[in-house]
Amino acid sequence: MQPGIPKYTPSAIQLAPVVTGKFGERPQPKRLTREAMRNYLKERGDQTVLILHAKVAQKSYGNEKRFFCPPPCVYLMGSGWKKKKEQMERDGCSEQESQPCAFIGIGNSEQEMQQLNLEGKNYCTAKTLYISDSDKRKHFMLSVKMFYGNSDDIGVFLSKRIKVISKPSKKKQSLKNADLCIASGTKVALFNRLRSQTVSTRYLHVEGGNFHASSQQWGAFYIHLLDDEESEGEEFTVRDGYIHYGQTVKLVCSVTGMALPRLIIRKVDKQTALLDADDPVSQLHKCAFYLKDTERMYLCLSQERIIQFQATPCPKEPNKEMINDGASWTIISTDKAEYTFYEGMGPINAPVTPVPVVESLQLNGGGDVAMLELTGQNFTPNLRVWFGDVEAETMYRCAESMLCVVPDISAFREGWRWVRQPVQVPVTLVRNDGVIYSTSLTFTYTPEPGPRPHCSAAGAILRANSSLLASNEPNTNSEGSYTNISTNSANVTSSTAAVVS
């Protein structure tokens, strides 16, 4: 526990005092101006909170404490954290008062929240979290309470949903328990634990352009299913479906894009790799990764290094190969909650949470008005949609849905009737006190070929520049296709399916 920082329990986290600024005054909330939005779009000084965690957690029984593995990790990303610290110190705060502080818990009142030490670094892992058998929840979410050293509240950030399991399934898994199986294209963590000792746990991780076994940080890797005939190459074609033992896979770091060579995933029984197992891979299973087209070489760790280990054939059992402890990896699915915000009009009185997250866009048209529907989470009535530096008329529906009127292209381009190039603008959400919540989505006004008819809305194509896979089907409304506003239909496009190692 750091000196001068109070011990927090879940029942107390809402009671952190708000410290006023100079002479006891805090600035009144200000609506965002176009000039402030232009400055933001130019500088992009976002503050981002990332919560990385496993999708499942093993329950602890009696007095035992099965700590979550890999440990949940909180990252503070973006240049905004440094800028916020500098701004607070310019306003008279000490270095300790401008330091972000964080506590993490499992969202129940019985267990104390644990402090995360963020001093001097942008990440921290919570190594001693567990869930006991007295907690009857089948799912839960991690809760991260953040504030500055001067007690200014940042907010409470939630992880994605985590499933509670009793122990790894030893039965031959079937696809009936799909939530315990691992699908192609999802993210996993891999860790190795020698002689079942927690202190010896090491995680597959990429740092400095190399794969290594880290005791401090873990990596999230896309696991892609390949055709057995797929050759080694920087680009490869991926398959859908659940991962089964005996199949060819590719592991790609979700942060750097670095990939390992083609691997065949094999089931581990004691200190042997089973060559003929073909059941679905399940959460917290032990598995081995054979480097395809090699002489019994397996992915293995030696201290912090990742090496190739040559297995030994079992003389009496041709369907097994003997491996050492360093080639046995535990596999688990991972998830990520990401929250991005920026104080567009300077310091605010309230927490930045709940942070809205936009998951998809849908264009609807009728008459002279084009409407954009936003689907996501944590929407509130005090949010407005902005297209670039233009505020749109916004209608709140519920916490998962909002509507807005697409601004006329003339708001962005004078002489728009002669524009022949597409005009692309970012879509953001802005709270009524000036907090900007960026999305990874953009809206593109696409000009029509030939003479322009006079209409109040230009043709539009939505481009979702996010990791979300969206439909390529044209959007239609009750009156038919979108051609009553433009001769262009509206399509949502996604990034390419090719994965580059």
Swiss-Prot record:
Any one Gene Ontology BP term: Notch signaling pathway
Entry's localization field: Nucleus; Cytoplasm
GO CC annotations, alphabetized: cytoplasm; MAML1-RBP-Jkappa- ICN1 complex; nucleus
InterPro entries reported for this sequence: Beta-trefoil_DNA-bd_dom, BTD_sf, CLS_fam, Ig-like_fold, Ig_E-set, p53-like_TF_DNA-bd_sf, RBP-J/Cbf11/Cbf12_DNA-bd, RBP-J/Cbf11_DNA-bd_sf
Region of interest (DNA-binding), residue spans: 58-68, 166-171, 193-198
Pfam families xref list: BTD (PF09270), LAG1-DNAbind (PF09271), TIG_SUH (PF20144)
Domain of life: Eukaryota
Keyword annotations from UniProtKB, A to Z: Activator, Cytoplasm, Developmental protein, DNA-binding, Notch signaling pathway, Nucleus, Repeat, Repressor, Transcription, Transcription regulation
One function term, GO molecular function aspect: RNA polymerase II cis-regulatory region sequence-specific DNA binding
Main location: nucleus
Range of residues in the leader sequence: none
Domain IPT/TIG as annotated: residue spans: 356-446
Subunit-level organization: Interacts with activated Notch proteins. Forms a ternary complex with nrarp and the intracellular domain (NICD) of notch1. Interacts with rita1, leading to nuclear export, prevent the interaction between rbpj and NICD product and subsequent down-regulation of the Notch signaling pathway.
Annotated family: Belongs to the Su(H) family.
Function recorded in the entry: Transcriptional regulator that plays a central role in Notch signaling, a signaling pathway involved in cell-cell communication that regulates a broad spectrum of cell-fate determinations. Acts as a transcriptional repressor when it is not associated with Notch proteins. When associated with some NICD product of Notch proteins (Notch intracellular domain), it acts as a transcriptional activator that activates transcription of Notch target genes. Required for the transcriptional activation of ESR1, suggesting that it is required during primary neurogenesis in embryos.
Protein name per its UniProtKB record: Suppressor of hairless protein homolog
Species this protein is from: Xenopus laevis
Organism classification: Eukaryota, Metazoa, Chordata, Craniata, Vertebrata
